[in-house]
Curated annotation (Swiss-Prot):
The keyword Amino-acid biosynthesis does not apply. Belongs to the class-II aminoacyl-tRNA synthetase family. Phe-tRNA synthetase alpha subunit type 1 subfamily. Its cofactor is Mg(2+). Tetramer of two alpha and two beta subunits. Keywords: Aminoacyl-tRNA synthetase, ATP-binding, Cytoplasm, Ligase, Magnesium, Metal-binding, Nucleotide-binding, Protein biosynthesis. Binds 2 magnesium ions per tetramer. Disulfide bonds: none annotated. Its EC number is 6.1.1.20. This is Phenylalanine--tRNA ligase alpha subunit. It catalyses: tRNA(Phe) + L-phenylalanine + ATP = L-phenylalanyl-tRNA(Phe) + AMP + diphosphate + H(+). NCBIfam families: pheS (TIGR00468). Mg(2+) binds at residue 257. GO terms for molecular function: ATP binding; catalytic activity, acting on a protein; magnesium ion binding; phenylalanine-tRNA ligase activity; transferase activity; tRNA binding.
């Protein structure tokens, strides 16, 4: 039995050392140390030995089992390390190689138009003023010379949240808040108010229930309609170019008097009449006028000393005119096939 154990040990250790992968090593563990392996058979034969031989052979058998177990464990660590190193070698990334650059977005067409207009007005000395989109009824209507019985207060025209709060229908409330807190000792008011507004309109080619608006306000001493006309002329030439036909026509707004609307010839039909311009050949681009004395007085401004003008236009309409977009809904559908036509070189490609 002694010779049998020694032969078994030598044979097993040789095969363990020659094992080239973990599967082969595991097969050897089962072969030599498993329930049906030679070590188990030798242990079963211990009962046939004499009382004097049994302790010696039992101790030797345990030493062989321990030696084989340790040999397998040691070889397993070596093979596992080799497997990990081989995997790392095959999956190594060369960090010096150029990577795959992620796609970079660009500014949305509306954002481009709004920023272009903001830059233009800032260049004319205007400041940007902002206000809440959930507005008090007072600032949205009453402070702008729209009394409580005015049709614009009807529930079908506005999104009311409570009896006294609503989603603002225009950015004019920002003008009212600006006038209310302005100190004329620091100079006249000269602001633009960009932002989202909400009206219960039926969505079509030129209308949306949510859209953006930029309103302008100038209030100071000796501000006249000529100043308003000059501002609108600069706006038209800057945003639309000399080739665009423009007309100014009298209109009515509760918060301005006198009032005027500026129309631009339809980009789709060239003034002949189509569904975009509703057959008129013209698309309204903005409304404006001299600030109504009542609006000044509501903000505690002396209307006998100070005067001003205000105007408001939608960047969506400007975008449609400048870039020949025939349906306002294209600006909100997030279709990359449409958006990619107006990539901003300032921020990269989509």
């Amino acid at each position: 039995m002694l010779e049998q154990l020694q032969t078994l040990k030598n044979e097993a250790e040789t095969q363990i050392n020659e094992a080239s992968d973990l599967k082969t090593l595991n097969d050897l563990r089962v072969k030599y140390l498993g329930k049906k392996g030679p070590m188990t058979e030798i242990m079963k034969q211990m009962g046939k030995l004499s009382a004097e031989e049994r302790p010696k052979m039992g101790s030797l058998a345990n030493e062989v089992r321990t030696a084989l177990t340790e040999a397998i464990s040691s070889k397993q660590q070596i093979l596992e390390t080799e497997a990990i190193n081989e995997k790392l070698k095959s999956e190594t990334i060369d960090v010096t190689l150029p990577g795959t650059a992620p796609s970079i977005g660009t500014k949305h067409l509306l954002t481009q138009v709004i920023e272009e207009m903001e830059d233009m007005f800032i260049g004319m000395g205007y400041e940007i003023a902002e206000g809440p989109e959930v507005e008090l009824d007072y600032y949205n209507f009453e402070a702008l010379n729209l009394p409580k019985d005015h049709p614009a207060r009807d529930m079908q025209d506005s999104f009311y949240i409570t009896e006294n709060t609503l989603l603002r229908t225009q950015t004019s409330p920002v003008q009212a808040r600006t006038m209310e807190k302005h100190d004329f000792s620091k100079g006249p008011i000269k602001v633009i108010c960009p932002g989202k507004v909400y009206r219960r309109d039926n969505d079509d080619a030129t209308h949306s229930h949510q859209f953006t608006q930029i309103e302008g306000l100038v209030v100071g001493e000796n501000i006249t309609f000529a100043d308003l006309k000059g501002t609108l002329t600069v706006l038209a030439k800057t945003m639309f170019g000399e080739e665009r036909e423009i007309r100014l026509r009298p209109s009515f707004f509760p918060f301005t008097e006198p009032s005027v609307e500026m129309d631009i010839s339809c980009f789709k039909c060239g003034g002949k009449g189509c569904r975009v311009c509703k057959g008129t050949g013209w698309i309204e681009i903005l409304g404006s006028g001299m600030v109504h004395p009542n609006v000044l007085e509501m903000s505690r401004i002396d209307s006998t000393r100070y005067s001003g003008f205000a105007f408001g236009l939608g960047p969506e309409r400007v975008a449609m005119l400048k870039y020949a977009v025939d349906d306002i809904r294209h600006l909100y559908t997030n279709d990359l096939r449409f958006t990619k036509q107006f990539q901003s070189t300032e921020t990269g490609e989509i």
